[in-house]
């Protein structure tokens, strides 16, 4: 069996899980998330634990088993604790401003870059004198947060020699 897949997911207090027709819905104090699950993988909720099982030991089933177990575990952690990421803008004259769901970045180009953040993400920008500006983003969905952080990083990749 998959090492990741065979471990049960323990539910923290205040987290509800509903499984119906290949859809797993997780609801907690920070929000709610849902994930479609492949028809071959079964998800069961028993006395405070979630068990993910597969029908056979085929390679496809093994890979899906660990994948869905990890995705559901990330959902449970997200709705109970949430996810947070910090990005530091290293460069001369780099700035970040957050106005509602609009993120305005000054990254050394001739123009400012404006990004509309998804509604689920809460962002703040801090700039202390004498240090690099920091962008702090929080969200319940780990995948969405990672995609937005990667998009922001791709706008101005670090220089390969010093990493700035």
Pin down the residues of each PLM region.
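N-terminal intrinsically disordered, cationic/polar leader segments
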Residues: 2-164
